[in-house]
């Protein structure tokens, strides 16, 4: 059962979400460009990884999250998931973890592998990835660490653990 929290999870701010979504679009464009420029036959695999990430983990993770059907800081993920999936009362399990990790591995690492001999494309991709990931932590993950009551987030999410260990946020749960 989720622990009680004396705090209210903040709604996603439109300006922050616009910045995050824009940075994500630039990151995706640089990834697509790196693949198309260096390994064009890999593009469909990369696109399949992206589409898999945009759907499958949203069922296994977002449809089970306390922010389901709410405009959370992860690119309005709770609202996005509610458009495609019914809320699931099933507990988080390894399927969500593997769906997220597997699809992320395909669409985030294929551009770097494709551009390994193209320094310009590799630097552009690495910079856009760093900016997007930094914004994601700042805009979404810090609030998730502070306000999440779903115990599986602290137990399984690697970014949750990194944010906590770096001291960027601490959970405000009460026991």
Predicted segments with their positions:
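Long, highly hydrophobic alpha-helical transmembrane signal-anchor segments
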Residues: 5-50, 97-129
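Eukaryotic polytopic
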Residues: 114-148, 152-153
């Amino acid at each position: 059962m989720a622990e009680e929290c004396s705090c209210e999870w903040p709604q996603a701010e439109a300006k922050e979400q616009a910045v995050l979504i824009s940075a994500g679009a630039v990151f995706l464009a640089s990834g697509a460009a790196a693949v198309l420029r260096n390994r064009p036959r890999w593009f469909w695999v990369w696109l399949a990884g992206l589409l898999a990430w945009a759907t499958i983990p949203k069922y296994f993770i977002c449809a089970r999250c306390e922010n389901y059907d709410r405009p959370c800081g992860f690119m309005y993920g709770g609202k996005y998931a509610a458009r495609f999936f019914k809320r699931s009362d099933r507990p988080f399990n390894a399927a969500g973890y593997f769906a997220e990790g597997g699809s992320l591995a395909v669409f985030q690492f294929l551009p770097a592998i494709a551009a390994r001999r193209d320094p310009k494309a590799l630097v552009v991709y690495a910079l856009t990835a760093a900016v997007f990931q930094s914004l994601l932590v700042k805009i979404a993950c810090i609030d998730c660490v502070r306000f999440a009551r779903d115990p599986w987030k602290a137990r399984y999410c690697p970014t949750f653990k990194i944010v906590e260990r770096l001291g960027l946020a601490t959970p405000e749960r009460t026991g």
